[in-house]
């Protein structure tokens, strides 16, 4: 493992090409971050963001800037879990800023966040939607390396999400988990579960009733609500794979 002395930066800008394909217009990244060339899946380009390191360490900082051009359709994925190692008396951080232009679509679906014992991680995401922009955002948080007996042994995990629609704040979620100060397995928090999925959807093409029916048929502990034109889905389970499969089965 190595801790990069400078802030790691990744910038990505996409556009709709003359042939109708979704292409990368601009990109820039510094170690250990990289961008894999897009794969076209029907009319959506799937782009993988990767990190060629074993995970985040103390004082590591990632700055991610994504710009989805007008009418382009992009699915962003990652190649591995976001591993947060022991940060000692400090913390690791990540800030993501996403702009989605008019009539563009983004499915943002990174693999789960995995905080190791004694780790601290601060994650902030700001998303700006233009007129008729569509967003499918998901985040999965693990209690730790459960198979190794590390269950809520991290020091702190905070995740702040702000979504703006035509420059008006329409969604704000602020989660701050401190296991030493909180009863994480209280019925009001994780209860008996170790993995949590959070999905936020702003998409006028999605019918809430159809989603509700799919959720009713799920074996997971899952709920759905609406707010300010958005759809919020929360799910709990003891395996990240089942949460990932649940999202896939929604077939959004």
UniProtKB/Swiss-Prot annotation:
GO terms for molecular function: nickel cation binding. One of its GO terms (cellular component) is cytoplasm. The keyword ATP-binding does not apply. The keyword Cytoplasm applies. InterPro entries: UreD. It is found in: Cytoplasm. Its main location: cytoplasm. Keywords: Chaperone, Cytoplasm, Nickel insertion. UreH, UreF and UreG form a complex that acts as a GTP-hydrolysis-dependent molecular chaperone, activating the urease apoprotein by helping to assemble the nickel containing metallocenter of UreC. The UreE protein probably delivers the nickel. Belongs to the UreD family. This is Urease accessory protein UreH. The lineage of its organism: Bacteria, Pseudomonadati, Campylobacterota, Epsilonproteobacteria, Campylobacterales.
């Amino acid at each position: 493992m190595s801790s990069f002395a400078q802030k790691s930066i990744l910038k990505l800008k996409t556009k709709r090409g003359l042939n109708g394909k979704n292409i990368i217009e601009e990109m820039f990244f510094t170690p250990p971050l990289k961008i894999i060339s897009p794969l076209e899946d029907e009319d959506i380009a799937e782009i993988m963001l990767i990190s060629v390191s074993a995970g985040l360490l103390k004082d590591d900082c990632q700055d991610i800037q994504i710009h989805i051009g007008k009418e382009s359709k992009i699915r962003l994925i990652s190649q591995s879990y976001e591993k947060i190692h022991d940060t000692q008396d400090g913390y690791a951080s990540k800030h993501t800023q996403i702009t989605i232009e008019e009539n563009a679509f983004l499915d943002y679906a990174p693999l789960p966040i995995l905080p190791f014992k004694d780790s601290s991680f601060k994650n902030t995401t700001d998303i700006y939607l233009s007129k008729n922009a569509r967003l499918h955002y998901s985040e999965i948080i693990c209690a730790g390396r459960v198979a190794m007996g590390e269950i809520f042994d991290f020091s702190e995990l905070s995740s702040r999400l702000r979504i703006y629609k035509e420059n008006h704040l329409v969604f704000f979620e602020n989660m701050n988990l401190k296991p030493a100060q909180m009863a994480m397995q209280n019925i009001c928090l994780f209860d008996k579960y170790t993995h949590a999925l959070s999905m936020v959807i702003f998409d006028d093409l999605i019918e809430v009733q159809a989603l509700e029916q799919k959720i009713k048929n799920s074996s997971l502990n899952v709920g759905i609500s609406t707010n300010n034109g958005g759809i919020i889905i929360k799910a709990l389970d003891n395996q990240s794979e089942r949460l990932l499969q649940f999202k896939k089965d929604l077939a959004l």
